[in-house]
From Swiss-Prot:
Pfam family of the protein (one): RecA
Subcellular location: Cytoplasm
Matches recorded under SUPFAM superfamilies: P-loop containing nucleoside triphosphate hydrolases, RecA protein, C-terminal domain
PROSITE patterns for the chain: RECA_1 (PS00321), RECA_2 (PS50162), RECA_3 (PS50163)
InterPro entries per the UniProt record, alphabetical: AAA+_ATPase, DNA_recomb/repair_RecA, DNA_recomb/repair_RecA_CS, P-loop_NTPase, RecA-like_C, RecA-like_N, RecA_ATP-bd, RecA_C_sf
GO molecular function: ATP binding; ATP hydrolysis activity; ATP-dependent DNA damage sensor activity; damaged DNA binding; single-stranded DNA binding
Annotated protein name in UniProt: Protein RecA
Lineage of origin: Bacteria, Pseudomonadati, Campylobacterota, Epsilonproteobacteria, Campylobacterales
Species in which this protein is naturally found: Helicobacter pylori (strain J99 / ATCC 700824)
Recorded name of the encoding gene: recA
Chain coiled-coil ranges: none
Biological process annotations from GO: DNA recombination; DNA repair; SOS response
Protein family (similarity comment): Belongs to the RecA family.
Function: Can catalyze the hydrolysis of ATP in the presence of single-stranded DNA, the ATP-dependent uptake of single-stranded DNA by duplex DNA, and the ATP-dependent hybridization of homologous single-stranded DNAs. It interacts with LexA causing its activation and leading to its autocatalytic cleavage.
Length: 347
């Protein structure tokens, strides 16, 4: 239905006035603005990139990665930093926990020489640094590790037994209100690593778990990823890593509630080769006959770990199988579930 001509003129005049005050593009007709594809940063995990629906975490948005201790939260975040740096991105790591392992980060592919790192003393200091570097327009990705460690100054300056109810939640709410628009304008991705706590006095229905820092982050985050350790990986009775499951519990840029499973190897991080084998077998791209795995006429190895070792050495072959997996799944298809049973014994 056509809009009245007088209304059109009034709206056009209002848009011109708004452009003068707030800059061009402050108010636009959606039909006049070309809808752009959402850019993404790979997570370093083939399965999680597919589960997120756009090939990774969206740029210019807030992401929350949470889970129990030693579930792979920081490992996943460091992989995202490494992928961002591979494409020329500038990254920062706000280490509120003062626990960044630089050697491990380097093993995961992070360019530690060019990684900006801050170890703030208080939550206010951390969030001020975050706002300043974001407003600079020169940063592509910021990781905050973790929300639980963003301790308000009043709590640090107070005595050990003092009660400071809701201080951290108010601090987070205030910071997120200020920074959300800036992140979008500067196309900067912000990742908050968060921990799980048990709700006090929880009875009846609903999950007894909650995340720290209040409710603001739950609302402002465009993507929330719940990552859990689900099994131990063993080879010759030696514990060599963990199997992790990541669930996209909130997604504003694609359908939510998709899941991905992957191996996190000690000292190496996410095993891309393990995912290639899992998805390859599921899609009949990689053949499994007994313990032997093969691709076309080439034997990959006897057992999953041997096949992973071969793919790690032969990058061209790994890339070829990865491409076939992506073509088979298709960019608009639902994520293919992983095998119901692992290819090798886990506990």
């Amino acid at each position: 239905m056509a809009i009245d001509e007088d209304k059109q003129k009034a709206i056009s005049l209002a848009i011109k006035q708004i452009d003068k005050v707030f800059g061009k593009g402050a108010l636009v007709r959606l039909g006049d603005k070309q809808v752009e594809k959402i850019d993404a940063i790979s997570t370093g995990s083939l399965g999680l990139d597919l589960a997120l629906g756009i090939g990774g975490v969206p740029k210019g948005r807030i992401i929350e990665i949470y889970g129990p201790e030693s579930s792979g939260k920081t490992t996943l975040s460091l992989h995202i930093i490494a992928e961002c740096q591979k494409n020329g991105g500038v990254c920062a790591f706000i280490d509120a926990e003062h626990a960044l392992d630089v050697y491990y980060a380097k093993r995961l592919g992070v360019d530690t020489e060019n990684l900006l790192v801050s170890q703030p003393s208080t939550g206010e200091e951390a969030l001020e640094i975050l706002e300043t570097i974001t407003r600079s327009g020169g940063i592509d990705l910021v990781v905050v590790d973790s929300v639980a460690a963003l301790t308000p100054k009043a709590e640090i300056d107070g005595d050990m037994g003092d009660q400071h109810v809701g201080l951290q939640a108010r601090l987070m709410s205030h910071a997120l209100r200020k920074i959300t628009g800036v992140l979008h304008k500067m196309n900067t991705t912000l990742i908050f690593i968060n921990q799980i706590r048990m709700k006090i006095g929880m009875t009846g229905y609903g999950s007894p778990e909650t995340t720290t820092g209040g409710n603001a982050l739950k609302f402002y985050a465009s993507v929330r990823i719940d990552i859990r350790r689900i099994a131990a990986l063993k080879q010759n009775e030696q514990h060599i890593g963990n199997r992790a499951k990541a669930k996209v519990v909130k997604n504003k840029v694609a359908p939510p509630f998709r899941e991905a499973e992957f191996d996190i190897m000690f000292g190496e991080g996410i095993s891309k080769e393990g995912e290639i084998i899992d998805y390859g077998v599921k899609l009949d791209i990689v053949d499994k006959s007994g313990a032997w795995l093969s691709y076309q006429d080439k034997k990959l190895g006897q057992g999953r770990e041997n096949a992973k070792a071969l793919l790690k050495e032969d990058k061209a072959l790994a890339d070829e199988i990865t491409l076939k997996i992506k073509e088979s799944i298709g960019s608009n298809e639902e994520i293919m579930p992983l095998p119901d049973e692992p290819l090798e014994e886990m506990e």
